[in-house]
Amino acid sequence: DLNFDGIKEDVLFYLGSFGASGTKHFDAYVWNPNTEHYDKIEEFKDIPNPKISDKYKCILSRVYVSSAENEYAKYVCTNGHLIKVAELRQYWKGNIYPERDRAVYEEHFVKANVWKRNLKLNQISDFWKPVVPF
């Protein structure tokens, strides 16, 4: 259920793995009961390594930017479109912040712009845990 409307007939088509880290991309189609056809979610193909979270009703992504940096994003489906609502960046020592072994930054874009800095992994929002390695 890609848009979390309770209809389970949604479909993903694997487009392939790309880049040195094998980033996976998919096309996504959701069943529209009004038209009795599938509607394409255009933004889905741009979400790297998507993971559907039924628990948090969102789609999570992860990208290995480099051996010392990861980026994660949270998307929600609104009016048939996927909107990025949060981002998490993880850096390792020697990359951007040489004084730290690891730096984690979390940002939320909806309602209030929440910015959390220098987090320990146990301080990140719970919805990240399916995609962030511990």
Model-derived segments and their meaning:
Residues 2, 12-13, 20, 28-29, ...:
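Acidic/His-rich structured neighborhood in mature extracellular/periplasmic domains
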Residues 2-16, 55-61:
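Acidic/hydrophobic-patterned starts of short beta strands in beta-sheet-rich repeat architectures
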Residues 9, 26-27, 73:
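Residue-level detector of short, conserved catalytic/binding motifs and their immediate flanks
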Residues 19-24, 67-70:
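Short, solvent-exposed loop/turn segments at conserved positions within beta-propeller repeat blades
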Residues 24-47:
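Extracellular C-terminal loop/segment signatures of secreted glycoproteins
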Residues 37-44, 53-56, 85-86:
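Low-complexity, Pro/Ser/Thr- and charge-rich linker/hinge segments at domain boundaries
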Residues 45-51, 94:
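Repeated scaffold domains used in trafficking and secretory/extracellular systems
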Residues 56-134:
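Acidic, small-residue rich beta-repeat scaffolds with periodic aromatic anchors
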